């Protein structure tokens, strides 16, 4: 790829995202989503590997179908109510179509099949964009229409996402697929609270973005595409691996770390809404994800690859430190004590 193309594509992603999140008209929102889709496809297929081309094709087909559904939903609503305003989605069929369209775009169960395959075929930094930035515009549309959405449908999809995201991640050895199922599981937590407290859903997404970005950047630094590559990276980058372990435990939602905050607040909010069974179910389903996060953490720090007895360990980092990774990792680990302030601001 031409070196000048990447900045243009990244700027196009920023433009598409900005158009969608700032628009109040369905056609403008749809335009932003289309710009995003067209900008990310060259980044997915950058390596010209058959798997990358396959991933780009799958991504294009699913996103095109979802965009068509968004347009159809908005046209149905405009036909019935005479409104093109995003917040005025009142027609029941339009609400159902929009929920399906956004679920396809986000990769919520049962429309999740494309997401792990596309992530597996993408470079690590493109996979980071797909897991974080590309989910922001569709999620914004869900937040803007949250008053009109069906709570029972979203709760069902959320619980299914948490279950399937945890279950399918158990036997994976590829880091990108593990993080894809982790993303599906986290989307379940966001979807279950979206109708009742949209601001809390947005906070959960922000914290998920910080933690996932830290993991992807650390994996990109050590070039770890599967578990065995993480296993052999400990001798080269011990500090980065130890940090990666803590960030993974934070993603799992263990108490002293940042990732515990959104889970705690969501369970508290669900209990207030008298949805204790749903809160219990999603809390229990998060144990499935905890297993594969622990396995990743175990591989990154606790186990060492088999070496001969005269093998010299390299107790120095072979790669220069990265400031963005350090900042994101610190935020992923240390924000829990600030949770009252963060919750008050949000």
From Swiss-Prot:
Its main location: mitochondrion. One of its GO terms (cellular component) is mitochondrial inner membrane. GO terms for molecular function: NADH dehydrogenase (ubiquinone) activity. InterPro entries: Complex_I_Subunit_2, NADH_DH_su2_C, NADH_UbQ_OxRdtase_chain2, ND/Mrp_TM. One of its GO terms (biological process) is mitochondrial electron transport, NADH to ubiquinone. Pfam families: NADH_dehy_S2_C (PF06444), Proton_antipo_M (PF00361). It is a multi-pass membrane protein. Its EC number is 7.1.1.2. Keywords: Electron transport, Membrane, Mitochondrion, Mitochondrion inner membrane, NAD, Respiratory chain, Translocase, Transmembrane, Transmembrane helix, Transport, Ubiquinone. Core subunit of the mitochondrial membrane respiratory chain NADH dehydrogenase (Complex I) that is believed to belong to the minimal assembly required for catalysis. Complex I functions in the transfer of electrons from NADH to the respiratory chain. The immediate electron acceptor for the enzyme is believed to be ubiquinone. Belongs to the complex I subunit 2 family. This is NADH-ubiquinone oxidoreductase chain 2. It comes from Sibirionetta formosa. The gene is MT-ND2.
């Amino acid at each position: 790829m031409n070196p000048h193309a990447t900045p243009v594509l990244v700027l196009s992603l920023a433009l598409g995202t900005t158009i969608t999140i700032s628009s109040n008209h369905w056609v403008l929102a749809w335009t932003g989503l289309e710009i995003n889709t067209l900008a990310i496809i060259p980044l997915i297929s950058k390596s010209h590997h058959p798997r990358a081309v396959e991933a780009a094709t799958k991504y294009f087909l699913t996103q095109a179908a979802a965009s068509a559904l968004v347009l159809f939903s908005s046209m149905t609503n405009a036909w019935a109510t005479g409104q093109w305003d995003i917040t005025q989605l009142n027609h029941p069929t339009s609400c159902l179509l929009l929920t399906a369209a956004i679920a396809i775009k986000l990769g919520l169960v049962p429309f999740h099949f494309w997401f792990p395959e596309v992530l597996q075929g993408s470079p690590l930094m493109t996979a980071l964009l797909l897991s974080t930035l590309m989910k922001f515009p569709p999620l914004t549309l869900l937040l803007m229409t949250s008053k009109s959405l069906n709570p029972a449908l979203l709760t069902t999809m959320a619980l299914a996402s948490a279950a399937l995201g945890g279950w399918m991640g158990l036997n994976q050895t590829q880091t990108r697929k593990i993080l894809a199922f982790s993303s599906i599981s986290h989307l379940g937590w966001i979807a279950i609270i979206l109708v009742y407290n949209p601001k809390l859903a947005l906070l959960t997404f922000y914290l998920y973005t910080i933690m996932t970005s830290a993991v992807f950047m650390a994996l990109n630094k050590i070039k770890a595409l599967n578990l065995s590559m993480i296993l052999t990276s400990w001798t080269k980058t011990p500090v980065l691996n130890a940090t990666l372990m803590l960030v993974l435990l934070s993603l799992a939602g263990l108490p002293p770390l940042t990732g515990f905050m959104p889970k705690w607040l969501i369970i508290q909010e669900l209990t207030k809404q008298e949805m204790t069974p749903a809160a219990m179910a999603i809390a229990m389903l998060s144990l499935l994800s905890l297993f594969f996060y622990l396995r990743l953490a175990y591989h990154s720090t606790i186990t060492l690859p088999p070496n001969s007895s005269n093998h010299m360990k390299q107790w120095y980092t072979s790669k220069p430190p990265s400031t963005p990774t350090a900042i994101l990792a610190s935020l992923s680990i240390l924000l829990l004590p600030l949770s009252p302030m963060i919750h008050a601001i949000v």
